[in-house]
Amino acid sequence: MAAQALALLREVARLEAPLEELRALHSVLQAVPLNELREQAAELRLGPLFSLLNENHREKTALCVSILERLLQAMEPVHVARNLRVDLQRGLIHPDDSVKILTLSQIGRIVENSDAVTEILNNAELLKQIVYCIGGENLSVAKAAIKSLSRISLTQAGLEALFESNLLDDLKSVMKTNDIVRYRVYELIVEISSVSPESLNYCTTSGLVTQLLRELTGEDVLVRATCIEMVTSLAYTHHGRQYLAQEGVIDQISNIIVGADSDPFSSFYLPGFVKFFGNLAVMDSPQQICERYPIFVEKVFEMTESQDPTMTGVAVDTVGILGSNVEGKQVLQKTGTRFERLLMRIGHQSKNAPVELKIRCLDAISSLLYLPPEQQTDDLLRMTESWFSALSRDPLELFRGISSQPFPELHCAALKVFTAIANQPWAQKLMFNIPGFVEYVVDRSVEQDKSSKDAKYELVKALANSKTIAEIFGNPNYLRLRTYLSEGPYYVKPVSTTAVEGAE
């Protein structure tokens, strides 16, 4: 088959209008294993295919792109970088986006290869074209360009090429295209900044991080909403958080939240600002963040009462994030009856809100109630039990009812709540004392789809692996759980058949 492909490739090179040959080559290549093509890589002459891309013929272009995609995979990245550099440069300025995407996918292979990436770094014109691809209308092209530049910047040589040459001017020039492109460049800068303190230093020296932060705290509410997402990404790293604190950005974000009550347009940016603090609290110290920025906790409680489902959803998510570790749980516990009212509200919403918000409420409840075995002190167990009780008059029945609704996502989210409390003795006693609950847990006929079967299996696993389950559920039920566990999530009980003498 590889020989046939090579013969067709030679035919394509020989003819002026080889449309039928391209179709045949495209068809043959689908059947040739990649390892066979690799063995013939030295024989592959791709010049004619690249030349055909310059003809304004839609079908030829589509066929050539597909053929090149396959053949280039058979070539080593170093070979592509050294021998096809002119074709790569032309590909990046081709009017057809599929050609640009093909070219960028090859550049993606090259920058992943430590031997080949040098060829890119030494090609200023190619780097410039990659930068200008960020400004194109096609999002896939822009994303691929951002990914390649981000990968290039992982090395010292890459950082220098991007920030200590004319390329930085090209980057700033591209930013002026429009708002969308400017945000794409910010996205690239944040990706690079997140790698290391040194990378962040290059980005801050360029002035682009400062520009992003200036827009974040500026007057345009829509710009704020976009910029806070990128700043939140930067805050995922320790050095990023340090930088934001040193520059006073965290204090500024807090002050904007304080002033949000008098801003009629605060609903545009407030959810993002609250999310920022939620993530900050979990990554650093919930207690320190909540004590230093009390407006954050205040605003979360306020937003759970909002009639705006966007606000409520973000507040619920943030409570879940905040309560995902013990320190965060204790911070919430200190708010006393206010948090009890919040739990009651979340419990109510998990039953009565639109489906999407129900799921977010259930996820938050799971996060709040989960306690790893090594952290199950008497005080913390009493706390999670009291939280569970605050959710509803009969919370176990509430979640069991939700789990019986015909929405797989809701069903899984309710099972996740049971799984979160499954290793806590007080919850095991509750489950055991509810008539039919143990039977419900080991009944495989309830779950029909894969995600539901997986969720049920996680519940069984959490129960079966608990040290207190045999004592509370009793040995027969414990053995049923162990059997379920050993059979796996997708076990189907074989149907027994009885042979009857004389039956046809």
UniProtKB/Swiss-Prot annotation:
Gene3D superfamilies: Leucine-rich Repeat Variant. Rich in dileucine repeats, which have been implicated in trafficking of a variety of transmembrane proteins. The gene is PSMD5. InterPro entries: ARM-like, ARM-type_fold, PSMD5. GO terms for cellular component: cytosol; proteasome accessory complex. GO terms for biological process: proteasome assembly. Acts as a chaperone during the assembly of the 26S proteasome, specifically of the base subcomplex of the PA700/19S regulatory complex (RC). In the initial step of the base subcomplex assembly is part of an intermediate PSMD5:PSMC2:PSMC1:PSMD2 module which probably assembles with a PSMD10:PSMC4:PSMC5:PAAF1 module followed by dissociation of PSMD5. It holds the Pfam family Proteasom_PSMB. Keywords: Acetylation, Chaperone. Interacts with PSMC1, PSMC2, PSMD1 and PSMD6. Part of transient complex containing PSMD5, PSMC2, PSMC1 and PSMD2 formed during the assembly of the 26S proteasome. Signal peptide: none annotated. This is 26S proteasome non-ATPase regulatory subunit 5. The modification N-acetylalanine is found at A2. It comes from the Eukaryota. Belongs to the proteasome subunit S5B/HSM3 family.
